[in-house]
Amino acid sequence: MIKKLAPIALATLAYSNCSIATEQQVSKQWFNSIEYTHINNDYYDFDGYQLVSHYYFEEQQSSGVLDDYGYLDTDTNFRVNYSGGDYYNDIGLSGEYFFNNWFAVADMRDVRDLDNYTLGLGYLFADALKVSVNRDVRSYGDDYFRLKAQYNLQINDKDYLGFSAETDDELDVWNVSARYFNHLSGSHYITVDVGHQDSLYNSASNAMISYYFGDHYAIGAGLDDSELVLQGKYFINDKYYLTANYTESGSAELYNLKFVAQF
């Protein structure tokens, strides 16, 4: 039980040393992260890692906390990621290009496999509703169209409700999600994330609630397909922060550490 509560305990102890809160509203354009995941169960261990660099061609304004920059991406952006583990490694590229309210989508899961990619076209309505039609091409299995919609309801200058829905052209695979972002007072915020995914063979739901306090700390707890998830975050300053996650899944335990640098 102690190891499950470690992220929360560390954040709570550190809070006693935090200074008077100030709201963290900053602008960033370039987001980079390095992530390590370890899975341990009765039968095997697995180690995985991921490097991500995500660049926006316009500055992104934070919502008040240092890891939230709004629900919708509405500016041209480009992303490169490298993921690897005990049995694989991939180099992926993706991006969106905006021209007025129209935008084009491109995604390649692994640059060494040009037979698997996504191309799409979408439209942004009033900076609040983002709709796109995407074509997923696969070297194994059928190609298919995918429809995606995202909506941001801005409650005030900080609080918002975000909704997303996505499905294939035959409605066999679909997912929905929502995010609530609320400014309580000072530098105290709360976020609630919920989602559900459904396919021909299985379905899963998830939920997470996070609480931000002071300038440097956040804790969270939730469920991922009925499995316990605990999270702690430490914001070193407006450029760097750390995230630690623990997930209990049956006889397996998942540990995740991530370091983010944003400029």
Which residue stretches match the model-derived regions?
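Cleavable N-terminal export/targeting peptides
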Residues: 1-31, 42-45, 60-72
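Transmembrane beta-strand segments of Gram-negative outer membrane beta-barrel proteins
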Residues: 26-36, 73-82
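Repeated loop/turn-to-beta-strand initiation elements of outer-membrane beta-barrel proteins
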Residues: 30, 60-63, 99-106, 127-133, ...
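Residue-level signature of outer-membrane beta-barrel architecture
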Residues: 38, 55, 97-99, 123-125, ...
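Outer-membrane beta-barrel "beta-signal"
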Residues: 46-60, 147-149, 230, 234, ...
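Detector for outer-membrane/organellar transmembrane beta-barrel domains
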Residues: 128, 140-222
